[in-house]
Amino acid sequence: MFAAPINMFSLAYPEKSSNWTNRFQMFATQNMWTFILLDSYNGRLWQVQYSTQDLDNLFCIPINKYELVENNERCIFSIQPLTSMYQYYLINDNTGDMWKFQWSTKGDDYRWIERFR
């Protein structure tokens, strides 16, 4: 399980010139309990799931553990849904490079990302 509370004022309320402003985006999926969190600067992805029942079903799991750009190059990434509610395209809007990824509630073996050529 992954938990990283934002308890630093500078991250919770970044200045307009900060690298954290507009960096992260949350996308709703067709599953009302699951969201995709995108770091739009480097392409990292997390599956975020919540529950109104208990804290045991709250989690944030990486789909893509590695940055998809080199040398801390700032890019703008976006995602687009595919026909399956579990699969999306991840697109580097600067270069046009694309990846296909899948989220899942079944476990890590069903969560993946691959370069689309």
Language model features with spans:
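Hydrophobic membrane-insertion alpha-helices, especially the h-region
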Residues: 1-7
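Structural signature of eukaryotic scaffold interfaces centered on beta-propeller domains
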Residues: 25-30, 79-83
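Solvent-exposed interaction surfaces and binding hotspots enriched for charged
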Residues: 25-27, 36-40, 46
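Short beta-strand motif characteristic of blades in beta-propeller domains
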Residues: 33-40, 87-93
